[in-house]
């Protein structure tokens, strides 16, 4: 048996890969006297923090989890009928255990290397097929951040696709209030004129329309004529919809919607106090090249077999930068996978049965309430009833509180109730009893629900089947499902199998102890709009984590609301804009961005209403100070901000960072420091104290939230005191913004993806101040060890003082293209044959590989990677010497599948053994890529973004 963790902290050496002895060996190899001496050589003295962080000492796993149990127990789990876009759901246990709690799924990276990502790509294709099927539209993306931001993205997509020259976007007053607020925030930054009103009274001249279908308060409208009227004036029609309702009501694509958005939360993903949940978007084919987010498409591999990949990547922010259609990067892949698997598990009959049950229970409730004399305002319904309760409203709410039931309070005289799949007949009777008590009437027995669609007008009832692809009817038993999930997981490479040395991505350990609390009911089953009196545990968690992150970064205030790093950037830039406007300087709308910046930086600046001016990099990859000063002079009084990444995307600590900050401040601008590389600074430097005004953090990098195959993420925005009033506004329990708020919300839930905040909270508690600093030091040690060991085989493109790198290094493989024809992509694909995920390709410099090992990888794994890279260099040398063919070699043909190697005939210029087992250790533990190299061009020329017919895989 494995021993339980001791009462003292033994977590730090479990998180940090190299042992003390290994660290000593590595320090000798790189020529550093000690870890402290190494940090002195790497980090500029002007920004080096000497004092330890004011954080508690490290604690044991047992102690931390017990303390978190105490915090969680402060939350009160009520039976929720609030609805408003968030609904109770049953997560299939087979999905809970084998996906959400399985590191093969949650530790994977975004599937930019498709050959080793076929499992989650297939799961995402299921999700896309499900969304397109239920919405009746041509194409769906692979998830957005939440329903509110998906609606905001629909607005910007409508503006790009509309034939109208109007600046007006019309939003129905029947949308959820939090959606209205998020859309309003986005519209203000982009200069879009928002008109909110009742669509039944006609439309103004506008470029787009946003409807809610069904309405927030329950009505199910026939929008066919409205869509025709909108199209007649050149407007694009978007609607926010509900996937479960679409099992029974007419798909938006059939009545004329061009875009459908919403949340897949009720397909098996708990409340989590607001997230994470997968937002979705589907649209007509005409808009596909402007659609935000990632898109899984079908292509073929080098052997002609079907293979999946991310399609149309040239439209993404990391390529188009300030011309991007969106700043969406990390989305909600893990949650989208769960939602798609929910549909596979239940199948078309099961999903429809759930929808029919919810609708019939709602009808039974309506009849019972009418019998009590409650006026139901909506004559049509799926799952929600709007109730005019008048003067009895406070008494009903008090009775509900006594029964531990949450109702939605619309205003002082109206309530609403929303049902979901978790509601039982006993629950419904208790709900009716609450209304009877509040009205001072005798309890009435609930009549048996009738299998009827009376609440849905005949004109908008869905005709025809749902989820018609065979994949949704392929699972008959849990045995089937278990094996299907195992088959998918076995196709992929994640951190549970290998190091993922992606530069700028920080693929570190996501410890089991950190993950355990996210499924606790006290965290998972809390509605985001539950009364504050029911969420003191969450508020203690949020306040504690906020204080810790401020201490770590040196900032004065923070918002945990942004649910991705890109949203954190956006929120920080909105704060800067609002600050300048409050100071009477609205003309400050230019953002300076170095040429090497992350692609999200210019995309976020554009969304915040800023003009982007690019600053050159010098020969060493640093910000060119002369060009920076020239750009500052060029834009003059229009300067709003400079965005820099630190340490730089070139993997070095720029010596002149304080000088850069001073130059911007002297010109009246603010400094935005991208915190994507914070893993190199925790405990050794605090950006809030060396000149930066605002940063976002990636809790899914530095603070151990797993990447989930492309989300979830959390991107808190931290600021100095003068920007604190301009952090994202927090919505109240009704989903409305305080009129005094200076900036609107950037996420639909008040605290974003609060359900995964226990992960960084536990990480910080387990590591303590000393452990966090040591993690940074070892991350830098590991990167310098790799750079030192590989420098004789591949040039390291950039280095700082003393020839050191920060937490990552760039290997320059560009010369090999000329000498051998081998590219960075060829090396990346060949690494798959060695059992590795590739480093980051062609960023920030085209044709290079950027390696970030993180502190969690031990010396043995580093040596395995180094061995692979050296062996690959020897294989390239064989091509250079003419020993191997320039076009037919192990690199150009990589990766090699078992199918390729077991073919009866072998016509290649190298032996099968070299292809399969280039190093001896692979004979013990070999990963086999399920497909050969994927043909990217074919996939974009022949775009298919839904599941193929089964016979295609024969």
Curated annotation (Swiss-Prot):
The keyword Protein transport does not apply. The modification N6-(pyridoxal phosphate)lysine is found at residue 701. Keywords: Oxidoreductase, Pyridoxal phosphate. It is an enzyme of class 1 (oxidoreductase). It comes from the Bacteria. Its cofactor is pyridoxal 5'-phosphate. The glycine cleavage system is composed of four proteins: P, T, L and H. This is Glycine dehydrogenase (decarboxylating). It comes from Bordetella pertussis (strain Tohama I / ATCC BAA-589 / NCTC 13251). The gene is gcvP.
């Amino acid at each position: 048996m494995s021993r339980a963790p001791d009462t003292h902290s033994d977590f730090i050496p479990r998180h940090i890969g190299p042992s003390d002895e290994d660290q000593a060996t590595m320090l000798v190899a790189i020529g550093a006297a000690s870890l402290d001496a190494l940090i002195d050589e790497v980090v500029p003295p002007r920004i080096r923090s000497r004092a330890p962080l004011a954080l508690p000492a490290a604690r044991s796993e047992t102690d931390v989890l017990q303390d978190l149990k105490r915090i969680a127990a402060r939350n009160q789990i009520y039976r929720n009928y609030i609805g408003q876009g968030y609904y109770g759901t049953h997560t299939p246990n087979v999905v809970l255990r084998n996906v959400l709690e399985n590191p093969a799924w949650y530790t994977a990276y975004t599937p930019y290397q498709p050959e080793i990502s076929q499992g989650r790509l297939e799961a995402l294709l299921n999700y896309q097929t499900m969304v397109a099927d239920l919405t009746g539209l041509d194409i769906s993306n692979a998830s957005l951040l939440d329903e509110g931001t998906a609606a905001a993205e629909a607005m910007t997509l409508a503006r790009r696709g509309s034939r109208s020259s109007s600046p007006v976007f019309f939003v129905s007053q029947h949308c959820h209030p939090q959606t209205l607020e998020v859309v309003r925030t986005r519209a203000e930054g982009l200069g879009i004129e928002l008109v909110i009103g009742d669509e039944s009274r006609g439309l103004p001249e506008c470029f787009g329309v946003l409807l809610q279908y069904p309405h927030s308060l329950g009505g199910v409208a026939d929008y066919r004529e409205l869509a025709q009227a909108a199209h007649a004036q050149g407007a694009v029609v978007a609607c926010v919809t509900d996937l479960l309702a679409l099992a029974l009501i007419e798909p938006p694509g059939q009545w004329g919607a061009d875009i459908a958005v919403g949340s897949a939360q009720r397909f098996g993903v708990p409340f989590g106090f607001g997230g994470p949940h997968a937002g979705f978007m589907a649209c007509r084919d005409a808009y596909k090249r402007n659609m935000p987010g990632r898109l899984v498409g079908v292509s073929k591999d080098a052997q002609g077999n079907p293979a999946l990949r991310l399609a149309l990547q040239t439209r993404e922010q990391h390529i188009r930068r300030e011309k991007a259609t969106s700043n969406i990067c990390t989305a909600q892949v893990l949650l989208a996978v769960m939602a798609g698997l929910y549909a596979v598990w239940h199948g078309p009959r099961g999903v429809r049965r759930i929808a029919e049950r919810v609708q019939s229970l709602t009808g039974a409730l309506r009849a019972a309430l009418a019998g009590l004399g409650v006026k139901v305002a909506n004559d049509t319904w799926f799952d929600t009833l709007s109730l005019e309760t008048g003067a009895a409203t406070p008494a009903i709410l008090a009775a509900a509180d006594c029964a531990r039931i949450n109702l939605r309070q619309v205003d002082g005289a109206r309530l609403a109730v929303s049902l979901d799949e978790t509601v039982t007949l006993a629950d419904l009777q208790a709900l009716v009893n609450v209304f009877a008590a509040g009205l001072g009437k005798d309890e009435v027995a609930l009549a048996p629900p009738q299998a009827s669609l009376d609440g849905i007008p005949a004109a908008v009832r869905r005709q025809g089947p749902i989820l018609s692809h065979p994949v949704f009817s392929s699972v008959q038993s849990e045995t089937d499902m278990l094996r299907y999930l195992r088959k998918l997981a076995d196709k992929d490479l994640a951190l549970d199998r290998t190091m993922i040395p992606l530069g700028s991505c920080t693929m570190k350990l996501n410890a089991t102890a950190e993950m355990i609390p996210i499924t606790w009911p006290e965290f998972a089953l809390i509605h985001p709009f539950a009364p504050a009196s029911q969420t003191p545990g969450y508020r203690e968690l949020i306040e504690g984590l906020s204080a810790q992150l401020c201490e770590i970064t040196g900032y004065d205030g923070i918002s945990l609301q942004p649910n991705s790093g890109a949203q954190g950037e956006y929120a920080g830039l909105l704060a800067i804009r609002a600050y300048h406007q409050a100071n009477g300087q609205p003309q400050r709308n230019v953002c300076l961005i170095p040429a090497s910046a992350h692609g999200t930086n210019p995309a976020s600046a554009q969304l915040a209403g800023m003009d982007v001016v690019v600053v050159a990099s010098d020969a060493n990859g640093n910000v060119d100070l002369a060009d920076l000063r020239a750009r500052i002079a060029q834009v003059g009084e229009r300067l709003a901000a400079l965005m820099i990444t630190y340490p730089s995307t070139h993997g070095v600590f720029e010596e002149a960072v304080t000088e850069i900050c001073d130059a911007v401040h002297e010109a009246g601008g603010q400094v935005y420091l991208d915190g994507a590389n914070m893993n190199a600074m925790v405990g050794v430097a605090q950006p809030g104290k060396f000149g930066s005004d605002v940063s976002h953090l990636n809790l899914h990098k530095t603070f151990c939230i797993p990447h989930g195959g492309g989300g979830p993420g959390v991107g808190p925005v931290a600021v100095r005191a003068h920007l604190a009033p301009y952090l994202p506004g927090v919505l109240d329990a009704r989903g409305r913004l305080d009129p005094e708020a200076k900036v609107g919300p950037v996420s639909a839930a008040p605290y974003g993806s609060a359900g995964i905040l226990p992960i960084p909270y536990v990480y910080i508690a387990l590591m303590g101040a000393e452990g966090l600093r040591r993690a940074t030091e070892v991350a830098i040690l590991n990167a310098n060890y790799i750079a030192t060991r590989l420098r004789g085989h591949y040039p390291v493109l950039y280095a700082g003082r003393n020839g050191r790198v920060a937490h990552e290094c760039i290997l320059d493989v560009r010369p090999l293209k000329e000498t051998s024809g081998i590219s960075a992509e060829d090396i990346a694909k060949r690494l798959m044959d060695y059992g590795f995920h590739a480093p980051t390709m062609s960023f920030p410099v085209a044709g290079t590989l950027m390696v970030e090992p993180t502190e969690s990888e031990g010396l043995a794994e580093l040596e395995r990677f180094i061995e692979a890279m050296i062996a690959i260099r020897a294989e390239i040398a064989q091509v250079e010497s003419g020993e191997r063919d320039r076009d037919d070699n192990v690199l150009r043909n990589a990766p090699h599948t078992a199918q390729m190697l077991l073919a009866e005939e072998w016509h290649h210029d190298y032996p099968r053994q070299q292809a399969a087992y280039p190093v001896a250790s692979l004979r013990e533990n070999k990963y086999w890529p399920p497909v050969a190299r994927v043909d990217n061009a074919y996939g974009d020329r022949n775009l298919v973004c839904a599941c193929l017919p089964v016979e295609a895989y024969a």
